[in-house]
Regions:
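Conserved functional hotspots at enzyme active or ligand-binding sites that engage polyanionic ligands
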Residues: 1-114
């Protein structure tokens, strides 16, 4: 399986607890490709949601359906960084354009207070 930064994948997440994302949901890979190509068994992702009310939260990025390959508009919720096992990524849906990926990465900086 080839995983690249900017890929949109369906992932099998553990059961949700509190506000954490859970179950099967789309994610975008934000981990750099040097690590993605390494023997490291994990990958850092940002959870996507179809709940458009999150589009106005600081740093979050609205992603039109044609950008993600998911069939409906989504929001990259940058406050929900998730480290997953590479085997948790089950189905590749698409790949973000570099311009959208840069917005997500900038949003992570906002979430981290950078």
């Amino acid at each position: 399986m080839t995983i690249a930064q900017g890929d949109v994948w369906w992932a099998d997440l553990p059961e949700a607890r509190g506000s954490a994302p859970g179950f099967r949901r789309p994610v975008v890979v934000v981990q750099g490709d040097a690590l993605n190509r390494s023997r490291l068994a994990t990958v850092v992702c940002v959870a996507l949601t179809s709940n458009l009310k999150w589009a106005t939260a600081p740093g979050n990025v609205s992603l039109p359906a044609n950008v993600t390959g998911l069939g409906k508009e989504s929001v990259a919720n940058v406050s929900q960084l998730i480290t997953l096992g590479k085997t948790d990524l089950t189905e590749r849906a698409g790949k973000l354009a570099r311009s959208k990926l840069e917005l997500v990465l900038s949003g992570i900086d906002v979430a981290l207070g950078r």
